Amino acid sequence: MTDLNLPSIFVPLVGLVFPAIAMTSLFLYVQKKKIV
């Protein structure tokens, strides 16, 4: 049962964390370009 619970926790976690990192890096890239 624990093996079935782990993916259900990790999938949404990765699905939220990965886009968050991508958005943050993109935002910082745009901010750096605007300043320069």
Curated annotation (Swiss-Prot):
Alphabetical GO biological process terms: photosynthesis
Q: What is this protein called?
A: Photosystem I reaction center subunit VIII
One GO cellular component term of this record is: photosystem I
Q: Which family does it belong to?
A: Belongs to the PsaI family.
The residues that cross the membrane are: 10-30
UniProt-listed InterPro entries = PSI_PsaI, PSI_PsaI_sf
Xref: NCBIfam families: PS_I_psaI (TIGR03052)
Fetch the HAMAP family from UniProt: PSI_PsaI (MF_00431)
The entry's keywords: Chloroplast, Membrane, Photosynthesis, Photosystem I, Plastid, Thylakoid, Transmembrane, Transmembrane helix
Q: What does this protein do?
A: May help in the organization of the PsaL subunit.
Question: What are the subcellular locations of this protein?
Answer: Plastid, Chloroplast thylakoid membrane
Look up keyword Thylakoid and say if it applies: yes
Concerning Pfam families, the annotation shows: PSI_8 (PF00796)
Summary of subunit composition and partner proteins: PSI consists of a core antenna complex that captures photons, and an electron transfer chain that converts photonic excitation into a charge separation. The eukaryotic PSI reaction center is composed of at least 11 subunits. Only detected in green leaves and not etioplasts; PSI is only assembled in green leaves.
